Amino acid sequence: MIEYLSKKISRVNLNNQKANRGGVLVKTHHGWEDKMEPLVAITFQIIQSQFTRTANDYLPGESGLTSTSMVIGKAVARLISREPIKLEHQLTIGDLFIEGFVYHGFAELIPPTRRDESYILKATPKWEELADIPLDIVKETILGSYKEPQPINKNMHKMHDYLYDPEAPYVVAVKNLQNVSWSINTSVLDKVIAPPSELEENDAKEQRRRSKVIEHRFITAKAEVLKEWDCFYQSFEIDYRGRIYNTEPFLNYQSSDMAKGLLLFSDPKPINESGKFWLAVHTAACYNQSYNINDIPEWCEEDYKSHLEEEGLEDISVDKMTLNDRVGWTMANWDKVFSCELDLKAEKPYMFLASCYEWDFVERTGMTQLPVAIDGSNNGWQHLGAISKDAHTGELVGLVPSIIQKDFYVQTAKCLIDLASKDERLTSLLQSMPMKHIRKGISKRGSMTRAYSAGASKIAENMYFDVRAEEFTDKYGITRKDCDKLAKLLVKAIDQVCPGPLQTMAYLQELAQFQIGKHELIGGTRAEFKRLKDRRRELLSKGELDDDELAELNDVSIQINSFKYELTYGNGETTIEWDTPSGFRARYENFTTVDFKARARLNGKDVKHVLKTPTDRPNIRGFMSGISPNFIHSMDAAHMALVIADWDGAFGAVHDSFATHASDVDDLLQKTKQVFIEMYTNDNFFDTIRQQLTNNTDSVEQPALGELDVGDINDSEYFFC
């Protein structure tokens, strides 16, 4: 590939006005030939990052060609000292380097499915071969792991033109995470198997299979390198909401089952009885066996049959049982545990295998080094429930004590079924499906994302993908039109089940609307303004103008300048900022955009670049739809950061899942509860929100608070578990 790109660049005629502009910019850099290896490596890193950190619009293994090309162009321009660089030149450079990967069959170009959208860059099965790219070329740029703890990236320190406080909890949290030492679980690595190589006929399943193939190759290649190190450290970054992410895109604790199964804390600790309890809970949850209502095991202490009948369910999975019964599962399956075999029937086969090896390690040494996690129960809804003090929501998401864990997705599914009763087709469809399939294919993802303001159209899109992946389209005849209808009803169902969170989201939207404000066009109607602008554009496009046309152009320009946008409501700000409990200053921007379009030729194929570039005018609709998810994400980020900052043990960080040594889980759970309660003990958190988001205190009416006592979390077994 390096040879191909080098030849292509060397053939560029610098005197030809029509020559590839990207090639010209690279070729005119002195010593460009010597930089081709790192330039190709950084291109690979960016494409891989785009494939793994995809936006909601793209599946794993896909990315937008325009956005990917732009990022590559910026990075290459920086390395060849060509910054600042115009957008169109960024794209020509990016296209040049992407072509190398397309030409050699590592990626392919897919036309957009809708007008005015970017081409899609998609990994081919051959992409996995790039895991063999030499380590001395890529160094840490794709590995993201180091032999020594790394200092915090300086770019993270100066956020939005203000200096960070080195003692702020979010800064301390990042430092603590970067001081956690890891090692590779070589026992698990030895039993890693490749995903199936046969192509799937189902498009959704094939996309998942291809993603797993790519993931497998990269994770194992990196693990083979890191297993030779006694320990390694990883670096982290913070986004604009304060959320903490691994910079390594694959082999990290925020990644997949395989990645987590391969990771151990490098420093073992003595295990105690509490540690054995939590290791048993963890082991059972990783396997997560399901039992039919008529086959509940004798070792279960609770009456799950009555519970299932009440919920309309036919099965219960171990992760919905009490903690004691999860331990009971592990005790009843010692033969399975001590066989230490990869069992693909497990929900998380590699994490289960790692827990099996951990039991062997515990028996032999009395020590433990496996990360054992406690997971939040629908974490977004937990924060919304705590803010609104909605007791009913609290019951569904573990803020209130209960004997058997409530299933949030089942509750929304049951309400959905009631709402669909007037639609004969939907009623027949839902009656043909067992509740577990309604929960998995129809209710789950939509109920999860609604907490972050997902609308019916996005929920329908995700729902249709899920039912295709589960083959429910064939089994039950579910169509895209059905998903559109079901998504609208699901939104209503969720809003009925969780009225407090709904009011909280609406309140956040109203505050955002007031803070940004409303501007009206003064001087005439929008139609008149548009007509004048169109006429000026028409006159300017003519080239030479006669005297009458020049006079008209001058008059039109004067009329256009007489139009003004004036603030008629609210504060008229262009951004919304707030300080989170961790000391992080979140800054949310959402500007109107204009379309940028450009034609290009890539690997002999005509493509169209489409990009929305921001203006300097705030997008009030964008602010209103985005404020709730961004605010809630900033709160879950603050919760985790406050826990980590006050934690002196090892920590595996996922936004709603915290891991540590088994012996320390009790202490971590107590710390997790304590921090959350302290965040929301405020009698009226709506006051805090209003003070943070806007300097106005009277114009937006607060919702009524519910009766939830967040202190009840102390007695809840299912808050994090």
Residue spans for each PLM region:
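Hydrophobic, well-ordered secondary-structure elements that form the walls
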Residues: 459, 640, 656-658
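Short glycine-rich phosphate-binding loop at a beta-alpha junction
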Residues: 508, 652, 659-662
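Non-catalytic nucleic-acid-binding interfaces of large nucleic-acid enzymes and RNP effectors
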Residues: 1-447, 451-631, 646, 669-670, ...
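Catalytic palm subdomain of template-directed nucleic-acid polymerases
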Residues: 659-672
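Short, surface-exposed charged micro-motifs
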Residues: 235, 650, 657
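Active-site palm subdomain of RNA-directed nucleic acid polymerases
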Residues: 636-654
